[in-house]
Structures are given as structure tokens and as C-alpha cells.
């Protein structure tokens, strides 16, 4: 009895309170409180259950966090048993870094669906007739309607050029224009630092460094112009003469001919967005949400859609601030309990969970977790989104416990001097959950 009393005092030291864990029938029923949640402890028996072992080890880890200089929030939920396992500072609002992409991904899968397509369309505006040399000529302009597809490459430009040729066009008397009306004109995200490595946000650009424009100057802050220059060269390669490229504008609303459409699905984009934590891909997904059914979407339009999905989980939106889709913003704030609420919501909806599961980095195997948790029970088990910016590190996702139950978890560290020390702490938590 004395031994068990000592154990109880040690476990409760530094904690806010002790409550009995109970089954929670639905997302809305969960109380988002800053407590350490444990199963009932029988005083006259030796602690041997999985939950007791996990709680004991996590309690020691959060005592360690209490003594550290940085802030930590943790939430762990048993999806199989439908009960809260452990929580520490789970309602403390913290910066999420790239775990913000989890909000964007789940919102996109819920609102748009995995099969929703980005559609980059090419239109010929004007009549097509032979010129004096008998060459079929477009007496007008060519318009490329941007849809913020981040996967466009030079190979797609070649497809467009071949489609123009197949339409019987051998010469374009007008110019090539980009229609960028699907989003606002802001090139950077809301709350981004000027010295961050930022993607340039435009509805029409080529993926990465895929420009093929060695002879010409690259317009670093005008990706749409780079796109049109590269397309012009592909048209010339197909023996189609062009009268030049124009500035960004709107496609005329009059009669025009659809030449071709390049499509990529939400699921296609999610893979690189989540595995590699690609910020441009995340922002493109964010604006797909805001642009659905309207033109000129702003970050506020996108944030409202994400917040509407959060409301579906029953989580109070007062504890979240959505400012962008990738987590670079200084204005993004979440809680560990929000992450877990969204992971639970995804788990309860197969059309969200199945594609999300495929895209999450796997510990010791791929993506941003390839070099983390390379041995032990967490390897090839933890599937989670990482997050790192200066002073912020986070990890949130799923792990299979040794008792066979699937857990949803979130670990957020703010104020850490280095990412490595926070990651090491997160990995230790994951080992406890997996072993």
C-alpha cells in the first residue's frame, strides 16, 4: 500500500488534476480541458495495464517538460476505444508550423473530395482561318486560365502546344495571356516573414525550377510570365508562330474555343504537400477551398472554409486562428486538442481517412519522417505531419499501440532553441505510445 501511495504522489506531481477516463460517444461530447487523464487506478494492485504504463511514462515526460524552458502541449486519444488517454496543456494556443497543413488537407478532403480536379484550361479567342500563305491562323489571342495547379511542368506545356496544333492553328496573330482571376493579387501569404523562404502565390506557374529558359531572364517575382515564355517556346517548337505574350488579364466572356484542359486531383497534390511538407502545394490547396464557386478568393475566404470544417468536429473555433494553408504565418494558432479533434473527425469519415492515411509521412520510412524514429516500435508505425519553423516544432498524426488500438496524437513545442531537441522529445513520446 505504501508503494502504491508513493507511485500516486509521483504521478500527480506537477499535474493539474486527476480524473477518471470515460468513453466519449462523439466528437462533440469531448470536454477540452487541460487535465491529465488516466484510467481508474486500483490502489492494492500492481500497475500492469497498457494505459497505466503509458500514463506513468508520459507523466514523467510532461514533468520533464514542466522543467524545460519551452512550452509543450500534448493530446492523445484512443480512436479504437473512443476515449481520451492523456492530455497536457492541450488547450494552450500555440503556433503549429507545418502541422497547419493537416487542417488544410482534412478540409480539402471534406469539402472538395479526393477526386476534385485542379483545371488549367486553354482557350482560343477569335476566328480561325487561313492567311494569305494558306496557314490556319488564330485571328485573336490564346488564354491560359490558371487554377493554381502546383504540378504543372514543361511536359504539360508540350501537351498544350500539341493541342493547339491539333486544333489546326499554325499561327497566332494575337498574344498569349494568363487569366489569374481565381485568387487575389497578393503574392505572399498573410503574416509571412519577409526573410522566410516563401513560395510566390500565383494561379499559373511551373513546378519548381522547371522553366527551360536559359537564353532568357527568369522573372523571379513573376512566375506567370515565366510560364507564358516557356509556353511560347513550345509553340514555336511545333512551328506555331506567336505575336508575343501579354500581361495578366481576364479571358473575354464572349465566344471562345476550348483547346485543352490539364487536370490534377486533390489526392495527387496532397501526396507531395504532406510527405514533403511543400508550402506551395499547401497554399494551392488552401485557395482551392476559397475559390470553390467564386473568383478572386482571398486568404479570408479560404480560412472561413477551414473554420467551417473545424466547427463540424464540435471544437470551439475560439481556440484557433487560421491565417494560411501551410503554417508559415505568424498569425496561425492552434491547440493540441484541435489537432486531435480533426484527426478523430477524419477517422470517422472513410472518404477523408483513407486518402489522408496514404499521404502522411511514415516514421523511419519516407517523407519528413524518413530519418526520425528509425528503430523501435515507432518505426514504420507512426504516421504523422511534422512542423518546423524557428522556435516551433510539432508532430501530429496516428500511431498503433501495442494493445492493437489506433491512437491520434498531437505534440506541439513552442519556444525551443533548436528543432532537434524538440524532435527528440516528440520521438520519445511516440515511442511510449507505440511500445
Question: Which residues does each PLM region occupy?
Answer:
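Bacterial Sec-dependent N-terminal signal peptides
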Residues: 1-35
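Beta-lactamase-like hydrolase cores
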Residues: 30-80, 84-93, 162-166, 435
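Extracytoplasmic
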Residues: 69-71, 89-91, 99-100, 115-117, ...
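Mid-domain, small-residue-enriched loop/turn segments at the edges of structured enzyme/sensor domains
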Residues: 71, 133-202, 238-240, 247, ...
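Active-site SXXK
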Residues: 82, 96-114, 176, 230-235, ...
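Small-residue-rich helix-loop
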Residues: 85-87, 290-435
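A conserved catalytic-loop motif detector
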Residues: 143, 159, 181-214, 218-229, ...
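A small/polar active-site loop signature that marks catalytic segments
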Residues: 211-357
Amino acid at each position: 500500500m505504501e508503494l502504491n501511495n508513493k507511485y500516486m504522489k509521483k504521478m500527480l506531481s506537477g499535474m493539474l488534476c486527476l480524473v477518471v477516463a470515460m468513453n466519449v460517444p462523439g466528437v462533440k461530447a469531448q470536454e477540452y480541458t487541460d487535465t491529465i487523464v488516466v484510467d481508474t487506478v486500483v490502489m492494492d494492485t500492481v500497475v500492469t495495464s497498457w494505459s497505466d504504463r503509458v500514463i506513468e511514462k508520459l507523466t514523467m515526460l510532461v514533468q520533464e517538460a514542466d522543467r524545460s524552458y519551452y512550452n509543450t502541449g500534448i493530446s492523445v486519444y484512443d480512436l479504437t476505444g473512443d476515449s481520451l488517454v492523456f492530455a497536457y496543456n492541450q488547450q494552450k494556443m500555440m503556433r503549429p508550423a507545418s502541422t497547419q497543413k493537416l487542417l488544410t488537407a482534412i478540409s480539402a478532403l471534406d469539402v472538395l473530395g479526393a477526386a476534385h480536379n485542379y483545371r488549367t484550361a486553354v482557350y482560343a479567342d477569335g476566328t480561325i482561318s487561313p492567311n494569305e500563305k494558306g496557314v490556319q491562323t488564330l485571328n485573336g489571342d490564346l488564354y491560359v486560365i490558371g487554377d493554381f495547379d502546383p504540378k504543372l511542368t514543361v511536359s504539360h506545356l508540350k501537351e498544350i502546344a500539341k493541342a493547339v496544333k491539333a486544333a489546326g492553328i499554325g499561327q497566332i496573330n494575337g498574344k498569349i495571356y494568363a487569366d489569374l482571376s481565381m485568387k487575389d493579387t497578393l503574392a505572399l501569404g498573410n503574416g509571412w516573414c519577409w526573410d522566410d523562404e516563401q513560395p510566390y502565390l500565383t494561379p499559373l506557374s511551373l513546378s519548381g525550377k522547371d522553366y527551360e529558359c536559359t537564353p532568357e531572364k527568369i522573372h523571379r517575382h513573376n512566375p506567370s510570365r515565366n510560364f507564358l515564355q516557356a509556353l511560347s517556346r513550345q509553340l514555336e517548337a511545333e512551328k506555331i508562330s506567336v505575336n508575343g505574350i501579354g500581361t495578366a488579364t481576364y479571358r473575354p466572356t464572349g465566344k471562345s474555343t476550348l483547346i485543352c484542359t490539364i487536370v490534377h486531383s486533390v489526392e495527387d497534390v496532397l501526396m507531395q504537400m504532406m510527405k514533403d511538407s511543400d508550402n506551395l502545394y499547401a497554399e494551392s490547396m488552401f485557395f482551392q477551398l476559397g475559390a470553390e464557386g467564386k473568383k478572386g478568393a482571398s486568404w479570408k475566404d479560404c480560412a472561413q472554409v477551414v473554420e467551417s470544417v473545424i466547427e463540424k468536429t464540435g471544437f470551439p473555433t475560439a481556440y484557433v486562428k487560421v491565417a494560411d494553408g501551410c503554417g508559415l504565418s505568424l498569425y496561425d494558432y492552434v491547440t493540441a486538442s484541435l489537432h486531435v479533434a480533426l484527426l478523430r473527425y477524419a477517422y470517422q469519415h472513410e472518404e477523408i481517412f483513407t486518402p489522408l492515411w496514404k499521404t502522411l509521412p511514415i516514421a523511419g520510412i519516407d517523407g519528413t519522417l524518413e530519418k526520425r524514429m528509425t528503430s523501435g516500435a515507432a518505426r514504420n508505425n507512426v504516421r504523422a505531419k511534422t512542423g518546423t519553423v524557428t522556435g516551433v516544432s510539432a508532430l501530429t498524426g496516428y500511431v498503433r499501440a501495442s494493445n492493437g488500438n489506433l491512437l491520434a496524437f498531437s505534440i506541439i513545442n513552442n519556444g525551443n532553441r533548436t528543432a532537434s531537441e524538440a524532435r527528440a522529445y516528440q520521438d520519445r513520446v511516440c515511442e511510449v505510445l507505440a511500445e
